[in-house]
Every structure is written in C-alpha cells, then in structure tokens.
C-alpha cells in the first residue's frame, strides 16, 4: 500500500484511492462541490485543489488524482489558499444574493465554503447572468440562476436513478442544466437531487418557505411506507412533521430515499382520527374511550371465539400485533391474519418469506429472475441495487409477469406460471443462465404470491431454486419482496390463523355469510370492506380511510411518526421506529389502546410499558433482540404442491404514489398522481 505525507503526517493508504479520499482518511477536510462518494468523478468545480509533490508547480484536483507512493500533499499552503479563494470568487460571479429568501439557507454548502474559503468582496463589476427556471415536476423546485454546474443532479439521474433526462446544454455563460425534452423528472427517486444539490438551485417544492433548519426538532427513525425500512430523519416543529430526509445506512438505503417516503408526510396531518367514535342509527358520533370500549365489550362477550376475528394492516408495529394476538388468544379466536392482501406465506420457516440475499448483497448478483414483481414501484431502493448489479456485474435480469419499464435492461421471459414452470424444469433457456451464474437471485413479488395458487407458485419457485443451485452454503439467492412494512413482523410473531382458523379471505367470507360477528381491523384498509356490512367492525387506526368508513367503533391510533415501535423489513432486519411528535387529540399508541381494551374484554394483558411488550416479544421470538442485524434464516419447505393457474402474474401496485392511508391523504402525492399517473407530465420547461 502507498505511503503518502499529508500536511506533514505520513500515513499508509489503500492503492487506487484518490488524493481526496486519502486526505479524508487522515482527518483532513477538503472542500468540494462536484465530488460525491456515490457518483462518478466529474472534476469540474475545482474547489478541491491541493498542492502535490512531486508534480507540476500548480494545484491539482484531489478528487480526480490517484495517490502514488511517496507523494507529498499540502492542503493548506499559500498556493492552495489562493487557488480556493479564486475558485470561490468565480463561482460567486453569477450567483445571486438570495440567501435571506433561499430555502437552502442554513444548510448550504456554498454558504459554508464561501465563509471558510472565500473573499470578503468581489471584483466583478459586470452584469450577472440569469437563467430561466425549469419545470421538474411537483417535487423539485428550480431556481436555475443559483446553479454552479456541479452536475451532481445529472450524474445521479443517469447513474443511480437510471433516467438520463437531465443534462447540460450550452457553453460558457450560456451553459445550463435542463431536461432535454422539457418535461418533468419522472423517477421514484427524483427528490434525491435536492439533497445532492450543494446550492439552492434545486430545493423542495412542497417545503418551500416552510421553516429554517434551526427551528426543527430532528428524530432518527425508519420509513414504513414500503417494506425496505429506509433510515430516515423526521424533522418536526411542535406537533407537525414538516419534512422527512434520508439517513445513511449502507446496508439498506445507502443515503437515498424514495419520493413517496419523503413527501407523503403531509398526509400525516390530514383526515386524521383524533377521538373515539361509536356508530348510532347509522351515523358515527364522538364518544369517550369508556363508551367505545363498552360498546366493543357488549359485542365480544355475546359471541364465542370462533365468531371473532382480527386483521392487521400494512403499517402496524409489531408490538401492537403481538398484543392483539394475545387478546384474540384469550378470547378463544384463531381467526387472525396479517396478510390483508391474501399472500400465501406461512409463518413457519423464516427463509421462505424474507429477502434472504440481503438488500446490499443484491448488487453482487450476476443473474436475476423477477417473478410477479415491479421493484421500481414496490421497492425503489431495492431497484437501485439491481441497477448496480447490471452496471457493475453485467447482470442478466429476466422478468416473469407484466412487462415493465425498469431503470436497466431486462429480458421479458413470459407472463405467467407456465414460464416459471419451464424455468424450474430446465426447459427454458434462462434456467441455464441461473445455473451458470456465480450469484443467481430469484425475487418473488406479491403479484405471484397473493393469487389463489400462491402456495403452488411458491413451491415451484423453491424447486427452481434447488434446480438452478440458487441456494448454497455461501449464497442464498431465494427472495421474497414484500410491499408492507408490517408483513414480516406479523409472520415472525405468528399473526396468522391457528389450526382451523380463518385467513383474511375466510374472515371476509365468514362476515358476509353471517358466521363472523365481530371483526377487529388494526389499520387494515386494503380489504373489501363491503363484505363486512353484517359484522360488528372495530377499526383501530390513524386515518379516516376505508376501514374507518365501515366501522361501528373507531379507536384513534398513532401514525409511525407518533410512536415508538418495532418493524421488520423485507430482508428480516429488525428496526426501531422512534416518536417524533405527539399524536393528535385523544389518539394513543396502538399497543396502549389494546392493553386498555383487554381489561374491559376480560382478556387483561400484564403490560404496563412498551418495554414490557418488547420483553415478551423477545421471549416469544429471539430474533427481535437482534436490532438492525441480519440473522440466518431456516429455509425449510416453501409453499405446497399443486396446480398453477394459467392467468398471468400482475403487479399489486397500479399507482405508486397512493398505496396506503397516509399517502392517500397527502396533497403532494395527489399532485404526483395527476402529474405522472393521470397525465404525461409534459410542460413548456418554464412553468412554476
């Protein structure tokens, strides 16, 4: 490994790294605008200049210069200071003095570096240039006169998002960043360009003029709007969540965040349930907690356990499902299910229902088979890993299911089970691709597993995995990609029907037939509520969505930003969500509501605090003691032998921007739906 001297200190660094990276290893900060660790090197801002010997007597761009043995690097010499001073002066020539009204103020790289490395005045006396603002959709606000042409946004769109719609046109003072066809930036990751922009050229349109960063309380948590479990930071002021930003987690989301996870937060304040309701004469009226609990108790105590059922929704924390399961057990009911979409997954062998490869390891795959899934919509951050697999390893990616427009080249193999069966028995050519791959991957989506023949599909996929050597001692490429944050946690605790119990479809059919009299909906809104008209429905949740509309008693719960809770992502990683704000009105944490209700129902739980619930959770399943870790999963048997339907697989998501009660209540997501789903998003390029 090369030995280099940085500001008089000799250190040993890995071969092949740049001077800038070597300086960071030595603890020396190098200013930069265009350089970013996850993007290709552009070397066009020249802010990272350093003095290097041996070499020409002029500063060198440290971001693009590889280290060499014996190199001497000076980062604060008179030459370097003068060079940085000059670069900063040139950058500020055309930059407007917008700091007092710029949303980037207080967290702006240009602001900070101008103070640290710039001059106290400008010698430029000519007119500043102005650039027309571009329309990049409902999420990204543009003030292009502020742009310093670092090209981070261009490289992100091209390299990470896979939508090469941004670029630079013109030369000299006529150069500008634009979308080639004057249209919206159509990507589920588009708002990450806001985080990357070192100035105020690209800012958040929904967050414009809302707050300054020093006014906000910052809470580290995780996202629950899909099953990836991205690390996020929730910025709030008093009782309102104002924005959600990504946090660094190399194993899950790196430092990116999907647009829905970032911008659906305005839905947290709309259509909220903030007090209990009881239905009288066909109308819901406000009630006290005691009235609501007593109304539930009257119905529960007049029915046997086999006439009572519970369905858990997609956003539930594991503690709440665990508490509700114990209440149902005490009432003698085996009719419980966390799979409101009807997924044919059992709670037995964990390896049969998680993403065994791990999100980070997906980028090492060299052959991928997607079955009944659209990762671009169902898990955009998983899709970025698959794109890296194509970029870095040249992975061949085959699709069985709907034809998709992904962010990387793919091979359409077929629409349904017959293609999957052909690959499994080796008669399809893609079977050989998987067999010859060093790191083959199969990803099963809910579009394949929520069908009536889901168990047969799962068994066929497992047969394919064995046939094509996808599961080995040093590699497990058998994966299930979930859409719901609550799903893996629910399966882990066994929130599925006991022997002789009913699943979601059975509960709904039983309620329609009059065999199920009481149904508890724990945040379950993605079901056919019309089948519940004859039953007494208790809805516990945070939004006035489908479940609340059909309920006879409504219990106001807390959204994910308003409570502490445990979630398990699609790869089986146990994660902690943390409370950022207080729930509105009389709303309470879900586990606490269930605990209070259990006393009235005669099924009293012993918990006093959330810690008590977590202790019991760990005792029931030790995996919940392994926070933010991946544990090895027993594969066991997957699915059940049977005939598969000839119907094609279909993606479970038709509108990426509205998949849950929070995003459906969001005005920003409604605008995205109008822009990208209901219209083609074309504009003149100068719209606001």
List the predicted regions and their residue ranges.
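Short, structural beta-strand-to-alpha-helix junction motif
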Residues: 3, 17-21, 317, 589
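Catalytic alpha/large subunits of respiratory electron-transfer oxidoreductases
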Residues: 92, 96, 143, 149-150, ...
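N-terminal leader/propeptide and maturation segments of large enzyme subunits in energy/redox metabolism
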Residues: 97-130, 441, 455-456, 581-638
């Amino acid at each position: 490994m090369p030995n280099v001297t940085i500001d008089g200190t000799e250190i040993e660094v890995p071969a092949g790294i740049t001077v800038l990276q070597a300086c960071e290893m030595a603890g020396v900060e190098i200013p930069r605008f265009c350089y970013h660790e996850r993007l290709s090197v552009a070397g066009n801002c020249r802010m990272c200049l350093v003095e290097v010997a041996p070499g020409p007597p002029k500063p060198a761009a440290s971001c693009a210069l590889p280290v060499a043995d014996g190199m001497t690097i000076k980062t604060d010499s008179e030459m370097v200071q003068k060079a940085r001073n000059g670069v900063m002066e040139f950058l500020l020539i055309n930059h407007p003095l917008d700091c007092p009204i710029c949303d980037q103020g207080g967290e702006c790289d240009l602001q900070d570096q101008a103070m640290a490395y710039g001059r106290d005045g400008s010698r430029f006396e000519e007119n500043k240039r102005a650039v027309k603002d571009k329309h990049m959709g409902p999420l990204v606000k543009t003030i292009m006169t502020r742009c310093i042409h670092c090209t981070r946004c261009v490289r992100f769109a091209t390299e990470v998002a896979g939508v090469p719609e941004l670029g630079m046109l013109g030369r000299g003072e006529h150069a500008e960043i634009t979308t080639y066809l004057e249209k919206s930036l159509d990507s589920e990751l588009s708002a990450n360009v806001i985080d990357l922009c070192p100035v105020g050229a690209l800012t958040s349109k929904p967050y414009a003029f809302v707050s300054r960063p020093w006014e906000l309380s910052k809470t580290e948590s995780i996202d629950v709007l899909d099953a990836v479990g991205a690390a996020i930071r929730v910025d709030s002021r008093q009782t309102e969540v104002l924005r959600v930003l990504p946090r660094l987690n190399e194993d899950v989301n790196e430092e990116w965040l999907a647009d829905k996870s970032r911008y659906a937060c305005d839905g947290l304040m709309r259509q909220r349930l903030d007090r209990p309701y009881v239905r009288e004469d066909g109308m819901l009226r406000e009630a006290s907690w005691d009235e609501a609990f007593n109304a539930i108790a009257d119905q529960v105590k007049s029915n046997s356990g086999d006439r009572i059922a519970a369905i858990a929704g997609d956003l539930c924390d594991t503690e709440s499902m665990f508490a509700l399961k114990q209440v149902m057990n005490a009432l003698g009911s085996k009719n419980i299910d966390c799979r409101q979409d009807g997924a044919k997954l059992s709670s037995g062998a964990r390896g049969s229902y998680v993403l065994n490869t791990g999100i980070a390891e997906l980028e090492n795959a060299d052959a991928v088979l997607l079955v009944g899934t659209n990762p671009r919509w169902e898990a955009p951050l998983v899709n970025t890993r698959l794109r890296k697999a194509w970029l870095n390893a040249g992975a061949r990616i085959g699709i069985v299911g709907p034809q998709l427009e992904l962010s990387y080249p793919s091979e359409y193999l077929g629409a349904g089970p017959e293609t999957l069966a052909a690959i499994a028995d080796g008669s399809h050519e893609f079977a050989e691709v998987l067999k010859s791959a060093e790191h083959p991957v199969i990803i099963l989506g809910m579009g394949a597993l929520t069908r009536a023949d889901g168990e047969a599909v799962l068994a066929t996929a497992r047969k394919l995995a064995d046939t094509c050597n996808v599961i080995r001692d040093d590699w497990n490429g058998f994966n299930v990609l979930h859409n719901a944050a609550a799903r893996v946690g629910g399966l882990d605790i066994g929130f599925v029907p006991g022997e002789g119990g009913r699943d979601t479809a059975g509960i709904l059919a039983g309620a329609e037939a009059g065999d199920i009299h009481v149904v508890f909906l724990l945040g379950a809104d993605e079901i056919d509520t019309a089948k519940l008209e004859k039953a007494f429905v208790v809805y516990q949740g945070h939004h006035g969505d489908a479940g609340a509309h059909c309920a006879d008693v409504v219990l106001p719960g807390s959204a994910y930003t308003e409570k502490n809770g445990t979630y398990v992502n699609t790869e089986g990683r146990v994660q902690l969500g943390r409370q950022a704000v207080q729930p509105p009105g009389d709303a309470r944490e879900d586990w606490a509501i269930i605990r209070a209700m259990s006393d009235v129902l005669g099924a009293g739980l012993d918990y006093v605090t959330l810690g008590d619930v977590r202790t019991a959770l760990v005792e029931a399943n030790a995996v919940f003691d392994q926070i933010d870790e991946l544990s090895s999963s027993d594969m066991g048997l997957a699915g059940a032998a049977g005939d598969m339907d000839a119907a094609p697989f279909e993606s479970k998501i038709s509108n990426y921007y509205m998949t849950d009660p929070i995003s459906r209540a969001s005005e920003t997501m409604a605008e995205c739906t109008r822009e990208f789903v209901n219209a083609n998003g074309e504009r003149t390029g100068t719209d606001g």
